[in-house]
Amino acid sequence: MFLGAAMAQVSLCMIVRDEAELLPRCLASVKDQVDELIVLDTGSRDRTPAIATEAGAKLLHTDWADDFSAARNQAIAAATGDWILVLDADEELILEAWTELRSQLDQPEALAFTVLREETQAGQVPYSRLSRLFRNRPDIRFQRPYHELVDDSLLALQQQEPNWRITAWPTPVIRHYGYGRDRLQQRGTAERMRQSLETWLADHPEDAYLCSKLGGLLVQEGDLKAAQRWLKQGLKQGRPEPAVRYELLYHLALLERRQGDLDAAIDRYQAALQEPVDAIHKLGAWVNLSHLYRDRGQLGLAYDAARQAVAAAPQATVALTALGLAARAIGNYPEAIAAYQQALQLDPNDPSLYQNLGAVLFQVGQLEASYAAFRQAIAGYEQQGSPEAQRLELRLQAMGIRL
C-alpha cells in the first residue's frame, strides 16, 4: 500500500478516538503517499481501530490522559521513517501539493516544513500555518496539552545547530473539515477544549498562542465577553509573533462585528493586515473587510478589498464570492458573473454560488441562464437537506418566477 522508493521515508503518525466516520476519508488521502502509518488509539468504542488496521496501520493503544502532546509523542516514538507527518482524522492531504513537497525531503539541511492548512468551516481563519512535517529525531517533540506544537523543539534545535533550515511551504498541503460548531457540540469537544485551555492558561497566562485559540473558540461558541478577555490578554503579552498576533486581531474583529461595532472591526482587520504573514494567510481579513465595507455602503473599498482577497488566494471560492458580491454592488456585472463562474469551476457543488450567479444574470436580463442557475441552486440545497431550497423558491415565486 505504501511507498517503497529509495527516497526519504515518511511515517504518518495519528492519534484517534471514535473517528470511524472521518478516518476513512483521511486514510484514503494518504494511500500510497507515506511509507508507514502509526495510529495511536486513545479509547475508541467504534470501528476506528479496525479501520486503521485494515488500512495497514501499526495500531497502538493508550489511556487518554487529557494531554495531546503526550499522545502525539507516544505515536511518533514508534515511527521508523526519516520524516514524521502528522494528521488528524478530520484532515486530508492535498495530493498535488504533497507530491511536490515530498520531493524536497532529501535536502540534507531540511529540518522541518511548516505547511498551510485550509480550513473549510465558516468562522475559522481560512488558512493556518502549522509544523506538521519534520525529521524523526528524539529531540523533536510536542509541547502543550492542547493545541500542541513542536515549534519550540525545532527552534531550540536550530539554535544549537544553525545549519538546519525550517521552510515555510507556500501552498496548502492539508485540508481541515472537522471543526464545525455542530460537530464540536455533538461530541462535547468544545467544553472539554475550553476547560483544558483555561486550566493551562491559569498557569501560563503569557501564552499568547493559546489565548488566541481559546478566544477564537469562545467567539465561535458565542461567549463574547470571555472571548474578549482572552484575546486582549494575548495582545498584552509583549508583541506576539506575527501569525499569533494576526489571529488575535482577526478573532477580535469577528467579535466586534458580532457586537455591531463595525468601526472597531474594520480597524482590527486593518491592523491584522499589517502583520508580516503569508499573503494567503490574510485571505480571511480581506474577505471580511470587503463584506463590512459593503454593509456600510463603502462599495469602492469593498471592491478593492475583494480584489486583494483574490490576489491573496486566486483559487479560493470565498475570495471569488466576495469579488462577485462587490463587483455586482458597484454595477460591474460582467466581472461579477465571471467571478461566480470561476468559483463554480472550483466548487461545482456549492448551491449558493449558483444562487448568486442566477441573481446577477437575472439583473442583466439573461433570463434563461438565470433560471437554469436558480434550478441548480434549488437542487443543490435540496440535496443538502437545506431549508434554503424552499426559501429560494418562495422568493422567486414572489417575483413571479416559477421554475
From Swiss-Prot:
Spans of the TPR repeats are 208-243, 244-282, 283-316, 317-350, 351-387
Q: Which Gene3D superfamilies match?
A: Spore Coat Polysaccharide Biosynthesis Protein SpsA, Chain A, Tetratricopeptide repeat domain
Q: Does the keyword Nucleotide-binding apply?
A: no
Family annotation (SMART domains): TPR
Q: Cite the InterPro entries for this sequence.
A: Glyco_trans_2-like, Nucleotide-diphossugar_trans, TPR-like_helical_dom_sf, TPR_rpt
> What CDD domains does this protein map onto?
Beta4Glucosyltransferase
Q: Which keywords accompany this UniProt record?
A: Repeat, TPR repeat
Protein name according to UniProt: TPR repeat-containing protein Synpcc7942_0270
Species of provenance: Synechococcus elongatus (strain ATCC 33912 / PCC 7942 / FACHB-805) (Anacystis nidulans R2)
